[in-house]
């Protein structure tokens, strides 16, 4: 890094440092908005929940939901570039363990190469990739996808590897479940085993999180778009291709969207930054939306705004 990761330096209208974009800027915006909303005697309750572990398994949000916490709506201030994102992808992690037979490198008659078998499988998966790309895209999220995340196998150059472990990640769309994903990968593995001699492999499921979406014309989405327009922000609808906590909230009956300052491309970067002006604008939008929602009128200008955003 060329900037101090925890320095919080201000340069040319930008805040620099680790997490500035993902998502300290969003937290700052929601806290600033909450402080202003709290001054007014509004009906209802505004809850701020700062949960941990979103980057891995979302254990913080999962615990919050299991505790019984619910609300009429939720805004997650991920970096969306001030676009309203009512949908995000899910994921399934899969491990394929290939078993070969160890032997000296000079004994091809005795060895079975587990890494070679993993390579055959990766090549066979090209057919699945083509099917996913040829399918009907989600209007906000595009196509489902997958990639090989890690591969591990072998002990020495002169030894046939008896084990190779391949970990894949499948990014899912709303409506795609874990069982269907497992069937996709198992079917290709079964077909391969029928034509590759001595192929011995086992597919197992790892961590999985669902994709989610809410209606574009819901009071939450429409209200945020209206608040954006009122604050001079182009009302934009988009999809979050990454996993975020919204799915847990939606599953528990709390409609949730992502809306926050900063560009997702800056997240996790070596020299992370966020435009300070976006934090201020985001806070203003959240304040306006909160006032309208708590007073039961989140959809002011909804028809015109939805037409413009769509």
What do these predicted ranges mean?
Residues 1-47:
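Active-site metal-coordination/substrate-binding segment of hydrolases
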Residues 8-9, 40-42, 66-69, 86-90, ...:
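Solvent-exposed alpha-helices and their adjacent loops that cap or buttress functional pockets
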Residues 13-14, 18, 47, 49-51, 72-75, 145, 236-240, ...:
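Structural motif
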Residues 21-22, 56, 241:
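Glycosyltransferase donor-binding loop in the core domain
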Residues 43-116, 120:
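Histidine/acidic-residue-rich, glycine-tolerant segments that coordinate divalent metal ions
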Residues 86, 95-310:
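Metal-dependent amide/peptide-bond hydrolase catalytic core
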């Amino acid at each position: 890094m060329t900037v101090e990761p925890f320095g919080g330096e201000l340069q040319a209208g930008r805040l620099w440092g680790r997490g500035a974009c993902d998502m300290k800027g969003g937290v700052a915006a929601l806290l600033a908005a909450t402080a202003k909303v709290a001054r007014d005697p509004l009906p209802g309750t505004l809850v701020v929940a700062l949960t941990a572990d979103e980057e891995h398994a979302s254990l913080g949000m999962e615990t919050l939901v299991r505790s019984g916490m619910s609300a009429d709506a939720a805004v997650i201030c991920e970096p969306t570039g001030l676009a309203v994102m009512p949908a995000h992808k899910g994921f399934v992690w899969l491990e394929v363990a290939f078993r070969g037979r160890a032997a000296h490198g000079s004994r091809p008659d005795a060895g079975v190469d587990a890494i070679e078998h993993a390579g055959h499988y990766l090549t066979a998966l090209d057919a699945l990739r083509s099917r996913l790309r040829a399918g009907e895209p989600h209007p906000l999220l595009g196509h489902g996808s997958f990639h090989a995340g890690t591969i591990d196998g072998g002990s020495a150059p002169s030894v046939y590897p008896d084990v190779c472990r391949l970990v894949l990640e499948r990014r899912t769309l709303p409506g795609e479940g874990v069982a269907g994903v497992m069937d996709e990968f198992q079917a290709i593995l079964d077909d391969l085993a029928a034509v590759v001699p001595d192929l011995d492999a086992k597919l197992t499921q790892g961590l999985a999180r669902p994709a989610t979406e809410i209606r574009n014309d819901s009071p939450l989405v429409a209200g945020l778009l209206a608040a954006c327009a009122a604050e001079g922000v182009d009302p934009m609808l988009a999809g979050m291709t990454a996993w975020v906590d919204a799915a847990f909230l939606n599953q528990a009956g709390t409609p949730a969207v992502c809306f926050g300052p900063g560009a997702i491309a800056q997240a996790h970067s070596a020299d992370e930054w966020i435009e300070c002006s976006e934090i201020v604008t985001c806070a203003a939008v959240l304040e306006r939306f909160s006032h309208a929602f708590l007073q039961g009128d989140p959809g002011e200008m909804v028809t015109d705004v939805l037409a413009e955003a769509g």
